[in-house]
Amino acid sequence: MFDTLLDPLIDASHKGFPHASAALRLSQIGAQGWNVLRGDLPLPLAVIRQDRLQHNLAWMQQFAQSRGLGLAPHGKTSMSPQLFRRQLDAGAWGM
């Protein structure tokens, strides 16, 4: 079941998904070649750069650990099981 949360089926009922496109797994979206600046995606939407996300995850975990703290991010803020998993994998003790 958790794999389904990490790679859900996304369709036009999801904010930011093109209305004319067929449903896709989350893992398939990057291969579509969609471009925000070309207007391929409806607005509003968020763009998350993997390199910056990875940097922020590592930085926050190191910041907490260097102060003897455990990190338990507030999951409701992002509402994203994929981000929950990344935070837990980076060392957060809970969500």
Put a short name on every predicted segment.
Residues 1-95:
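A charged N-terminal "starter" segment
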